[in-house]
Regions:
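Select transmembrane alpha-helical segments in multipass membrane proteins
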Residues: 1, 30-38, 62-73, 107-113, ...
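Transmembrane-helix bundle segments that line or gate the permeation/cavity pathway
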Residues: 1-18, 29-32, 42, 71-74, ...
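Membrane-interface loop-to-helix entry segments
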Residues: 3, 46-72, 82-92, 147-153
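Membrane-water interface regions at transmembrane-helix termini and the short interhelical loops
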Residues: 14-19, 36-58, 74, 129-142
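Transmembrane alpha-helical segments of multi-pass small-molecule transport proteins
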Residues: 20-46, 65, 119-131
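Extracellular/periplasmic helix-exit of transmembrane alpha-helices
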Residues: 70-93, 154-186
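Membrane-interface interhelical connector segments
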Residues: 92-108, 166-203
Length: 225
């Protein structure tokens, strides 16, 4: 929870600095954290059906709206083609990457860079989130539970990664923006906002994105308490 909050604070502060000129310092981070914790406490006190439901619905609408906006005004054809091809490659190499280990290739970085990091996150979140999902599943059929907790989130992630990943690759490929240089010089937390800056009404998009990230932490923290 602390690591997630730290990442969220970095991203929010970086976005406010990139588009609106707010300083990146301890005072700003503390102010953002104080507001974030306040929203989280209010969400917890009002319960799942009120505070958390409202925040979750708002975040869902914003994230879906951002996806549709980028898909329509971004490189639509490239996104569809790259997303379809990438999904095929993912399914084709899923089992290979699931069991890959650097047995004889000491310089192999896939398992070190990705698998171990993911597994550590899963071990931390799985028990707590599992209890939360079980609570939500009370009174629902197995089919409804599987669709809402596995099917719908999986589909959302596929579309989200296809749209944002495709746009990022297209910007790098066409030379419109050097995404990799931005990652190295400014960090991952700023790169999403440099990508947004290439789209029309960038500041409005950034504002909605920052608010959604802000509320997403509150809903995530609420679900594990």
């Amino acid at each position: 929870l602390a690591c997630s909050m730290a990442v969220g604070l970095m991203q929010i502060n970086s976005g406010l600095n990139f588009f609106f000129g707010l300083p990146i310092d301890g005072v700003t981070v503390f102010a953002i954290a104080a507001i974030m914790v306040t929203v989280y406490v209010v969400s917890c006190l009002t319960g799942i059906k009120k505070g958390m439901r409202v925040l979750s619905s708002f975040c869902t609408i914003v994230f879906i709206g951002l996806m549709v906006y980028v898909l329509c005004l971004g490189p639509t054809r490239f996104i569809v083609d790259a997303g379809t091809e990438s999904l095929g490659v993912f399914f084709n190499r899923f089992f290979e990457h699931s069991v890959i280990l650097p047995t004889m290739a000491e310089n192999e970085t896939w398992s070190k860079s990705w698998i171990i990091m993911f597994m550590a996150s899963f071990f931390v979140y799985a028990p707590i989130i599992g209890l939360f999902l079980a609570r939500l599943g009370k009174g629902r059929t197995v089919r409804e539970f599987i669709f809402m907790n596995i099917g719908a989130p999986t589909l959302f992630c596929i579309v989200w990664i296809a749209i944002w990943g495709g746009t990022t690759v297209w910007l790098q490929y066409t030379g419109i923006m050097d995404v990799w240089q931005s990652v190295n010089e400014k960090g991952l937390e700023v790169t999403i906002f440099t990508i947004l800056s290439t789209l029309p009404f960038a500041k409005i998009l950034a504002a909605f994105f920052i608010i959604a990230v802000f509320f997403s932490f509150s809903t995530m923290a609420d679900s594990i308490t």
